[in-house]
A protein has these predicted regions:
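A solvent-exposed, charged loop/short amphipathic helix patch at secondary-structure junctions
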Residues: 130-157
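A short acidic, amphipathic alpha-helical/loop segment
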Residues: 94-101, 203
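Hydrophobic/aromatic beta-strand patches that form the interior of the parallel beta-sheet core
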Residues: 9, 33, 108-110, 188-190
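Conserved phosphate-donor/acceptor-positioning beta-strand/loop module used by diverse small-molecule
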Residues: 105-125
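Glycine-rich phosphate-binding loop used to anchor ATP phosphates in small-molecule kinases
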Residues: 73-97
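PAPS-dependent sulfotransferases, especially Golgi type II membrane carbohydrate sulfotransferases
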Residues: 1-5, 147-163, 168-171, 175-189, ...
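Short aromatic-enriched loop/helix-cap "lid" or pocket-rim segments at secondary-structure transitions
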Residues: 44-50, 121-125, 201-203
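PAPS-dependent sulfotransferase catalytic core
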Residues: 1-77, 219-227
């Protein structure tokens, strides 16, 4: 199988969306190192954003704290290719700090989505939105100043509202980045449900500029505890009642002048 050098690949995704599996898929087919999340003690603040970076970006925007993190991280990308599917990066300035660098022309961003009911139920059974520090490090929180989706309508969904808000916020951010930056960085939009099939995986492989067929690694990082059927039905009922168009939300934000590059001062 002929392979083209992947150059630089990152993802824009929410987490619990198949990013670990995607890292294995890319490693297996490129026969190259593919990082999911660098979690060594010394990685935080250098290769992996810490809570300060995550909170700074989502409260104040792309400020000095965030930019200094990205200067450190991007300075480590020196080899011919670099692949990382870490979902936290897109929530703390990946696009803003990449699109004007020499890497941008050779970078591909995989916008990875998942069925919203499966995605949301995964967060809930793991209690991902019970402790605020988990949301600070890995996800987002509605208390942040910079957000695209109003969280107030989700408050009535007791027990699932935070996780649901996060799903819609990330869908809006994916649409926002695609609208605002896809002319500067190549973006490839896929769903987990599609790329774990042979046909879908091959479509992704070809979208990455590759030739021939690819192979699929086994499933990875799946929840050990299955979501109760009652939870799944509850989420299906809620999501079917919500009128939401991520592209419309993103376009309105752009029309209103929203940008994470507009930095606000700390209180």
């Amino acid at each position: 199988m002929r392979k083209v050098n992947p150059k630089v690949i990152f993802t824009l995704t929410a987490g619990r969306t198949g990013s670990a599996w995607l890292a294995d898929f890319l490693a297996q087919n490129y026969q190259a190192t593919s990082i999911h999340e660098p979690l060594g003690i010394e990685d935080f603040g250098v290769r992996m954003p810490d809570i300060k970076v995550m909170r700074s970006f989502n409260n104040y925007g792309n400020n000095n704290t965030v930019q200094e993190f990205w200067e450190r991280k991007l300075s480590l990308i020196q080899q011919n290719s670099y692949i990382e599917t870490n979902h936290t990066l897109g929530k703390c300035g990946l696009i803003e700090n990449l699109y004007q660098t020499p890497f941008a022309a050779d970078t591909k961003i995989i916008i990875l989505k998942r069925n919203i009911v499966k995605q949301c139920s995964s967060y809930i059974v793991r209690n991902d939105f019970v402790h605020i520090t988990t949301a600070w490090q890995w996800y987002l929180h509605p208390s942040y100043q910079k957000k695209l989706v109003n969280h107030t309508p989700f408050l009535k969904f007791d027990g699932v509202g935070l996780a649901l808000w996060y799903c819609y916020e990330m869908a809006a951010r994916q649409a926002f980045y695609k609208l605002a930056y896809s002319s500067s960085i190549k973006m490839i939009e896929v769903s987990l449900e599609d790329i774990v099939t042979p046909k879908g995986a091959n479509r992704l492989w070809q979208a990455l500029g590759q030739f021939g067929t690819c192979t699929l690694p086994p499933r990875k990082n799946e929840n050990q505890i299955q979501a109760p059927k009652s939870l799944v039905q509850h989420l299906k009922k809620i999501t079917s009642s919500i009128q939401f168009d991520a592209d419309e939300v993103a376009q309105q934000a752009l029309n209103d002048g929203f940008s994470f590059e507009n930095v606000s001062a700390a209180a």
